[in-house]
Regions:
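Activation segment of protein kinase catalytic domains, centered on the conserved DFG
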Residues: 117-129
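Short beta-strand micro-motifs within the conserved protein kinase catalytic domain, predominantly
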Residues: 87-100
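A conserved short helix/loop substructure at the end of the activation segment
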Residues: 243-246, 260-272
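Conserved catalytic-loop aspartate of Hanks-type protein kinases
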Residues: 205
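Activation segment/activation loop of eukaryotic-type protein kinase catalytic domains
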Residues: 154-188
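Catalytic-loop of the protein kinase fold
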Residues: 142-159
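Conserved short submotifs of the Hanks-type protein kinase catalytic core
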Residues: 97-110
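Glycine-rich ATP phosphate-binding loop
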Residues: 24-59
Length: 407
């Protein structure tokens, strides 16, 4: 694939679409379109023709360091090498302000909007297919020794033509001039170790997948009722996770929980995760349509209750990738770890002389009840409750964008 310089005057019908994190997003029509094939007779590349594209602004590129440019260049090559990643055709520059912009293939809808529009109609077979496509794309990214760093439902995109889900924003998911002591990302999806200041690794991407798996199961973004970033960050580090949705397949649930474990070493690598999702998809593909339809009907009312209750609490400002800077946060832990330590101390002080296991189990039960009251809101009469993740951190460093047509 060729990554090229796209003259700004080759773009028409440029219209503002939205603000995506630190970047302004526009739609446009590329007059010539991408290179599509090689004409052996004419001995030249043939272009696609008029093509709808997305323009994504790159802020403060002039202040970026060499490491940022090297990583961006590497990720551009990955996105154009593999069909599971949204293709970036090249770069252009807005002459009115001098800002550089990525020229990206346009998809039909992102995962967040798709789930909100179709959740009540989705079978588990369809949901697992979404998880399959996402994990397949991430397995390719990780196989190239790359890390995404900002996986969330806003940059998982769907193509109706190909009936496939893609990962987008690879390599350009943060400001070029981000300070080294800050993190960038969509807070509900950021891994706890990254929130607490550690470097981003592939296992941080796996954590993000766990939260996406929960969103696929519920139809709603995780932690959507939170108003305060610091409180959410602290609760994530202390082990708060979303409540598993009723009816979630056990294997899917177990994989999801492994992904969002507080200890990165306990999370599966992407190959193990993909194999698990793939085997689950194979199972559901062998189930008869009658059973799948019955399952969909059974989930319909339950999902309506979940969506109606949670949509009232969604904080739209939370689900934007941005720079975060948290100080003096504790080490990440799973919720049960904290409960065990806390209540063993309490029982010692009370001088209760009974079996230690009974004490700790009793303590856990009390804390779980207290934590539900503290962190969740009730969904129905059966006290089904729903909680809710982020990721990003690495040091940056600049190469100049060349004047030539091919980068």
């Amino acid at each position: 694939m060729i990554i090229e310089w796209v003259p700004y005057n080759n773009l028409q019908n440029i219209e503002y679409l939205t603000k995506g994190g630190i970047s302004e997003i526009y739609t446009a029509v590329w007059i010539d379109g991408r290179y599509e094939e090689w004409d052996s007779k004419e001995q030249k590349l043939i272009r696609y023709g008029r093509q709808e594209v997305i323009l994504k602004g790159l802020e403060n590129v002039e202040n970026a360091n060499q490491r940022w440019f090297e990583e961006a260049e590497s990720h551009l090559k990955i996105s154009n090498k593999w069909p599971q990643i949204v293709q970036c055709f090249g770069l252009t520059q807005n002459p009115s302000n001098g800002n550089y912009m990525l020229v990206i293939d346009r998809a039909d809808i992102d995962l967040r909007k798709y789930l909100q529009e179709t959740q009540n109609q989705l079978s588990w077979k369809e949901r697992i297919k979404i998880a399959h496509d996402i994990t397949l794309a991430l397995s390719i990214i990780h196989s190239e020794s790359a890390i995404h760093r900002d996986l969330h439902s806003g940059n998982i995109l769907y193509s109706k033509l190909n009936q496939r889900w893609y990962i987008s924003d690879l390599g350009f998911c943060g400001p070029a001039d981000k300070l080294t002591d800050s993190i960038y990302g969509n807070l509900p999806y950021i891994a706890p170790e990254v929130i607490s200041g550690k470097n981003t690794t592939k296992k941080a991407d796996i954590y993000s997948i766990g939260m996406l798996m929960w969103e696929i199961s519920s139809g709603q973004p995780p932690f959507s009722y939170y108003e305060n970033d610091y409180n959410l960050a602290l609760n994530i580090i202390n082990g708060m996770r979303p409540k598993v949705i009723s009816g979630t397949p056990l294997k899917y649930e177990n994989l999801m929980k492994q992904c969002w474990d507080a200890d990165p070493s306990n999370r599966p690598d992407i190959d193990t995760l993909f194999d698990g999702i793939y085997s689950l998809l194979q199972y559901y593909q062998n189930i008869s349509n009658e059973i799948l339809q019955q399952e969909t009907n059974n989930n319909l009312e339950n999902n309506k209750i979940i969506n109606n209750s949670m949509s009232k609490h969604i904080n739209s400002t939370l689900f934007t990738s941005k720079i975060h800077k948290f100080k003096n946060l504790p080490e990440p832990k799973n919720a049960i770890e904290g409960m065990s330590r806390k209540f063993s101390k309490v029982f010692k002080k009370l001088n209760i002389k009974s079996n230690n296991d009974i004490q700790i189990n009793y303590g856990k039960e009390i804390v779980e009840q207290q934590q539900i009251r503290q962190y969740n809101f009730n969904i129905d009469d059966e006290d089904e409750t729903y909680d809710y993740k982020n990721f990003h951190s690495e040091e940056d460093n600049v190469f100049e964008i060349p004047d030539g047509k091919i980068i």
